Amino acid sequence: MFLNTLKAVFGTKNDREVKKYFKRVTQINALEGKYQNLSDDELKAEFAKFKEQILSGEKNENDILNDVFAIVRETGKRTLNMRHFDVQLIGGMVLHDGKIAEMKTGEGKTLVATLPVVLNAMSGKGVHVVTVNDYLAKRDAEQMSAIYNFLGFSVGVILSSQNSDIEHKQAYDCDITYGTNNEFGFDYLRDNMKFSKVEKVQREHNFVIVDEVDSILIDEARTPLIISGPTNRTLDGYIKANEVAKQMQKGEAVLPPAKPEGDFVVDEKNRNILITEAGIAKAEKLFGVENLYSLDNAILAHQLDQALKAHNLFEKDVHYVLRNNEVIIVDEFTGRLSEGRRFSEGLHQALEAKENVKIQEESQTLADITFQNYFRMYNKLAGMTGTAQTEATEFSQIYSLDVISIPTNIPIKRQDKDDLIYKTQNEKFKAVIEEIKKANAKGQPVLVGTASIERSEVFHNMLVKEKIPHHVLNAKNHEQEALIIQDAGKKGAVTIATNMAGRGVDIKIDDEIRALGGLYIIGTERHESRRIDNQLRGRAGRQGDPGISRFYLSLEDNLLRIFGGDRIKSIMDRLGIEEGESIESRIVTRAVENAQKKVESLHFESRKHLLEYDDVANEQRKTIYRYRNELLDENYDVRAKISQNIAEYSANVMNDYILDESGSNVNFENLKAKILYECSTQISEKDFENLSVIEMQDKLSQILENSYNEKMSRLEIKELRNIERILYLQVLDNAWREHLYQMDILKTGIGLRGYNQKDPLVEYKKESYNLFLELVNRIKFDSIKLLFSVQFNQEEVQNLENKANEENEKLLQSSVEMGASEDNLGEAEFKKVPRNAPCPCGSGKKFKECHGKSGPKQGILA
């Protein structure tokens, strides 16, 4: 009560914020006369002066906001015959300040965006405008380009149907770029798989405006963008490698200078295989290749290595078992079967080849990121939506975004009626159909909102029986739906739509419909989120139009059944509600809203919890991508990095074979074998006599440096640096993919630590950090091994970068991109789905029974 009194006297925080913005609106309005008296050329010249002030650093965007907004308003009048209202100016300022502008349906968010877009595009750093589907991205870019082009800005659009990097790069190089959240995110991931900077398509992440921000940053927060694909190894290679491995003879380790007999030696201590010179020669003959360790045969060499490990280091019924013709890992710590897990780096396929069972193609995560972490990369993030206040806390805590509710230009006249609640769903369905028939009889248009495609089908079938003409929209074809939803306000129209269908398109009505009471919104059940319900209500009553909204519920609805249905049921029983009768009560409506608040709170905590885990991986991702970008820079001193890695490798290897602290006892035989195998370099025990541990490490480093320099001496410096850079990148990428796989495994089982009275998040941070340290060392040491072992001819040297790019392109072409919800699944994505596979929309149905059907259905046409 006291809080309400304070609000009545001083206003809410939102009221005070809006009041501040209104003061500036007055200043902008005062400039309207000045700019409307200028010719087109004079207006453009005036704008160019302000742009030059930004580029020179003489002024910043806030200094010139009033003039720029006034110029954009005048430009809108001249090019589109549309004048920004005062409340739209407020919306523009809210967006420029990096906040969320909550603007009701029909208030012109698309036009509002032009104000901050123009202001922030003046720096030349680019502005991104994000929408939920391709249709809206293309529509908004085309509609607003008249304003942008008049003021000298270029506009690009990113569409999922575009297959060319060239098209995407051209769009990103524009001053203003429109596109979907999925495409922006995937382009970022793909850019961080490129082998040169010029091939990247995105520029700096400067300023982004996210339309329908609640859908993208809240609803899709738990859905990561993932590029996954098969490994680079063909299944045939494992079969060949298995046959070769069976013909190779195991030898015994001997002390140098004697050479081991046989084709390979087993290093059981380090669980490794060392192939002898004789073994290499035999393998090359059996494979029919000239050089097993050339770039072209690197995968084959790896497959042979794994095949030899499978035959000599992994024993059936000890390390794995065969069950139903599948290789299943035996956990080395518990002895239990680890069903669902697979050995990485092709070892599992090698074991399958060994046991002559079906070799399964293993997909791997090539790159991933959540929308939460992608959009937080921007220097400034802003958003627009009709519904954000219910999630204001989450926007503030997760994204540091304040939500400002913008007043409507004309007061809302829509009647939001209390819910009608029935005992059973069948009673509710009948009541909805009767209400549709009443409205339809007088010509009042009705929009029926459903929570699922399945419910849409129920009402579609019932309306067919009643012979009522109608349309059914299931968020399948955005462009076709947009055309249909525009007509949903016409006389006699009945439209059934899932929550997301046709979003972003206004439903307009004429005077005849206004006289009938406007558009009638019928919600067939409450969503778990109040925000989704508000979105449905908001389809009626745009720009001061009349309208009606009402929800029809039943005690069998999931929300009421799980959260609070007992209390409502007891009320209905006390009132003696009979079959077919409903209860309409503000108390009951509030009880439903309280149930929704419970669910919203649970979902918020879940998203927050997931983000805490993803933030750990995100810091690692940023570190790897930052280092990768350094390697792409031609001025980066990769040779210095290699020298540093050689020194660390030398110290690490030497420590493995020093048997006491003084360094007087060294296992030189195994050390020599390791250096010869991994670095193709022979060392002499004499070189290390009477040296301390540190001196021995330095000596080994010096020997390897000299060996490396000699190996590469025939190459020109520029060629050598390019080889080093490309090979280093390949090692980094492969190690990063393996790391993502290990992180997935860790995350899958980390929750079980809670049973041992340990905080899973703390444990996850510890173990992921250890995995990251292993990743860093793997990159350092594997790059050294590859650089020492690889052999190439001049043609391979010249085509190295092209070859790397071709292999990467093949990997991307065979990859699967998994992104956000069904509203973002366009035709291009659905075409890739097999008919009997689960539908990507998450309905649980087969694709052919869901989105695999033909486009939007029509009922009996009038």
UniProtKB/Swiss-Prot annotation:
Cross-referenced InterPro entries: Helicase_ATP-bd, Helicase_C-like, P-loop_NTPase, SEC_C_motif, SecA, SecA_DEAD, SecA_motor_DEAD, SecA_preprotein_X-link_dom
Instruction: Identify the CDD domains for this entry.
Output: DEXDc_SecA, SF2_C_secA
Q: Which cofactors does the annotated protein need, by name?
A: Zn(2+)
Alphabetic keyword roster: ATP-binding, Cell inner membrane, Cell membrane, Cytoplasm, Membrane, Metal-binding, Nucleotide-binding, Protein transport, Translocase, Translocation, Transport, Zinc
Main localization, broad class: membrane
**Residues the record lists as binding ATP:** Q88, G106, E107, G108, K109, T110, D506
Q: A single GO BP annotation from the record?
A: intracellular protein transmembrane transport
Report the catalytic activity. Answer: ATP + H2O + cellular proteinSide 1 = ADP + phosphate + cellular proteinSide 2
- Tell me what topology the record assigns in the membrane: Peripheral membrane protein
Q: What class of enzyme is it?
A: translocase
Pfam families from the xrefs?
P-loop_SecA, SEC-C, SecA_DEAD, SecA_PP_bind, SecA_SW
Query: PROSITE patterns of this UniProt entry?
Result: SECA_MOTOR_DEAD
How is the cofactor bound, as the UniProt entry phrases it? May bind 1 zinc ion per subunit.
Q: What is its EC number?
A: 7.4.2.8
Location(s) in or outside the cell: Cell inner membrane; Cytoplasm
Gene Ontology cellular component terms for the protein in this record: cell envelope Sec protein transport complex; cytosol; plasma membrane
The similarity comment for this entry is: Belongs to the SecA family.
Q: What does this protein do?
A: Part of the Sec protein translocase complex. Interacts with the SecYEG preprotein conducting channel. Has a central role in coupling the hydrolysis of ATP to the transfer of proteins into and across the cell membrane, serving as an ATP-driven molecular motor driving the stepwise translocation of polypeptide chains across the membrane.
Its subunit composition reads: Monomer and homodimer. Part of the essential Sec protein translocation apparatus which comprises SecA, SecYEG and auxiliary proteins SecDF-YajC and YidC.
> Which protein, by its recorded name, is this?
Protein translocase subunit SecA
